[in-house]
Amino acid sequence: MPRFKKGRDLNHWKTNRPDSDVGKLRIVGGVYGGRQIGYSGDPVTRPMKDDIREAVFNLVGGWTPGKIVFDLFAGTGAMGLEAISRGATKCFFVERHFPTVKIIRENVQTLDPDMNASVDASDSFFWCRKFLKDPASWPTEPWLVFFCPPYGLYVKSKDELLELIEKFKDAAPDESLIVVESDKRLDVSSLPDHESWEVRTYSPAVVSIFKKF
């Protein structure tokens, strides 16, 4: 069985930072910590809340430096930007919603015009299939892969998502991490090699983490 743990009360992670402004999110740690990034406010992007993102990076942050990041179904791009802030060397952002892609590109330019980032306006399923078919293009450094799709896809496209997660798990180099954000509609025991995942609940979010050794 997956290792279930209730996420620590989010009040534990809260500091005296004011809440993010409407239309803004905040990088919570690393070299860009405290800086705001743009957010359209469109619920289609459903960004992970600052406090949940902080809790997640308290779990994986020590593994982040030197990683190649894949922020799939990127939405606001906050996960990838947070990872870059905490020492990841490059991020591939993949998001199909064109207005949001524009905001991700603006956020990259605002934080660091020289950031090592690739922002692709593409369907994540299509992009991943193309990427996975070309092993010569795979980075050899360990990966940090974020799967944070709209929760409804775990119902509408469950099998396709699980297949994609499994393929990334198999393709990733040793020392890689995979982070899957879902809600309770995903039975985490259906994740590939499900006994190896650590699962935390930050209601309504369920965060599952796989470390490849």
Q: Which residues does each predicted region cover?
A:
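Class I S-adenosyl-L-methionine-dependent methyltransferase catalytic core
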Residues: 1-213
